[in-house]
Regions:
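C-terminal substrate-binding/catalytic lobe of Rossmann-fold NAD(P)-dependent oxidoreductases
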Residues: 1-26, 108-230
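Glycine-rich, highly charged phosphate/nucleotide-binding loops
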Residues: 15-30, 36-45
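Structural motif
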Residues: 33-34, 57
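Alpha-helical scaffold segments in soluble metabolic enzymes
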Residues: 34, 46, 72, 97, ...
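Short, well-ordered coil/turn residues at beta-beta hairpins
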Residues: 38, 61-62, 185
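Short loop or secondary-structure boundary microenvironments that flank
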Residues: 41, 62-63, 88, 119, ...
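Rossmann-fold NAD(P)-binding glycine/threonine-rich loop
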Residues: 42-54, 61-84, 90-102
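Short, surface-exposed loop/turn motifs that are enriched in glycine and acidic residues
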Residues: 84-92, 119-126
């Protein structure tokens, strides 16, 4: 891999990895084969507009999208290859796969809960990773996530009991990321968990995704496709 450009919407008088920050996004993107995006939803959509115009591949690690924004991303994927993941960690994506298998295997007597802890600076909740895991639970039941949690409960730190999937989000300190999925009945609890110790695992995953995306046709892909999970 070769880092060819960095973009920023503010002016900084310094270099990163020996490269000056470029304020002209479109001009900067012309130098790249793949664009890796870790920003905020509004910026992601702006990036996709330019990438679509330039026919550039995009890896999206941004989270916190609304359903409308998700729909716009799907439209852009008809023009360019896009890989989108709420978490770029290979381990977390394996956790999602195992979550789906567990959900499919267990009957409705088991209550599903997603518990996540992140640093105090993280704004969205439940986190993109927590929602990924929630989708894993829903997929295992052949259901839509939103039908199981209810739209009115999105963007809340705690989902009240009584829903099919319960989320509990905590923001404190400088914790990189802890996630746990629990399936509980009156007789037992099954727990699947993942803890991140180094943020480099996210950049490693994003670079792996970018390399994988190089030879792909237009479409919306996920880490599940990259890892070749069934």
């Amino acid at each position: 891999f070769k880092l060819v450009t960095l973009t920023e919407n503010k002016i900084y008088n310094k270099k990163i990895a020996g490269i000056n920050l470029d304020l002209n996004t479109e001009q900067a993107f012309k130098k790249a084969d793949v664009i890796i995006d870790f920003t905020v939803p509004k910026c992601t959509l702006d990036i996709l507009k330019i990438a679509s115009k330039l026919k550039k591949r995009v890896v999206i690690g941004t989270t916190g999208f609304t359903q409308k924004e998700e729909s716009l991303i799907r439209k852009f994927s008809k023009k360019i290859p896009i890989l989108k993941a709420g978490n770029m960690s290979l381990g977390v994506n394996l956790l999602m796969y195992l979550t789906e298998i567990a959900s499919k295997s267990l009957n409705d007597e088991y209550l599903s809960k997603v518990f996540e802890v992140h640093h105090k600076h993280k704004k969205d909740y439940p986190s993109g990773t927590a929602l990924m895991l929630g989708k894993g639970i829903a997929n295992g039941k052949n259901k839509n996530l939103y039908s199981l949690v209810g739209k009115k409960f999105l963007n809340k730190k705690f989902f009240p009991y009584g829903k099919k999937i319960n989320f509990n989000s905590i923001r404190k300190g400088e914790i990189i990321g802890e996630h746990e999925v629990a399936f509980s009945s009156g007789k037992e609890i099954i727990r699947l968990n993942h803890e991140a110790f180094d943020r480099a695992l996210y950049s490693d995953g994003a670079l792996t995704a970018g390399k994988w995306l190089i030879n792909k046709k237009s479409g919306l892909y996920s880490m599940r496709d990259l890892l070749n999970f069934e």
